Amino acid sequence: MDKQNRKAIIAGNWKMNKTATEAKALISELIPAVKDAGCEVVICVPFTDLVTAVEMTKGTNIHVGAEKVHFEKSGAFTGEISADMLTDLGVEYVVIGHSERRQYFAETNETVNKRTKAALAGGLKPIICVGESLDQREQGVTEELVRMQVKIALNGVTADELKNVVIAYEPIWAIGTGKTATADQAEEVCAAIRKVVGELYGEDAAKGLTVQYGGSMNPKNAEELLSKPDVDGGLIGGASLKADQFAVIVDAATKG
């Protein structure tokens, strides 16, 4: 299976942005802007916007994701949301292990693994984020680190479950900084992700895996990044908050 036969996915990660009122306005602009997309379009929104997003996107080509999920099904975990709660709302995707969760909320490779398995068990499609800091890149350990992150995240995930997994390479030094990995840097790490998945699950499984790039992808650099053979889509932060910018990236994925 080559790139043309893999599912390209452009996912917007709204982070802690947009009230329910603001979400309605943005989604109203997004629906016509991406209606002719040749790739899968996902918006991952704050918990408070999920109901609005699911209701407004019914009958459209936009899929809805959450930005976090807890690893337990239920119980005394004040403030947490389970996979069953999300799927019951009509949510399809969930972001797991974003660098901001790792940096500010003590997310670890082990909790990423627990959340991934809980998401899959609950019927969600996890978008697992992996990536290195600037120090780690300068030390030359990027591939070693990313391989470890992928292996731990997928520990206990079956080959059948892997079909519902997306992995996003997001270099931490490029998140919200305006800095972007070059297309060649992105390709190198995305190819390494596919390689380690091939070692774990076989070449066919690796060829079928959607690997995204996340890290200041924008309308100006999207086409070059998405033209690379192992970059199948993007996890988009700031540019996902503006319908016109997001639509340009979606169009680039359609061409890519």
PLM regions and their residue ranges:
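Active-site loop-to-helix "anion-binding N-cap" substructures in soluble metabolic enzymes
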Residues: 1-256
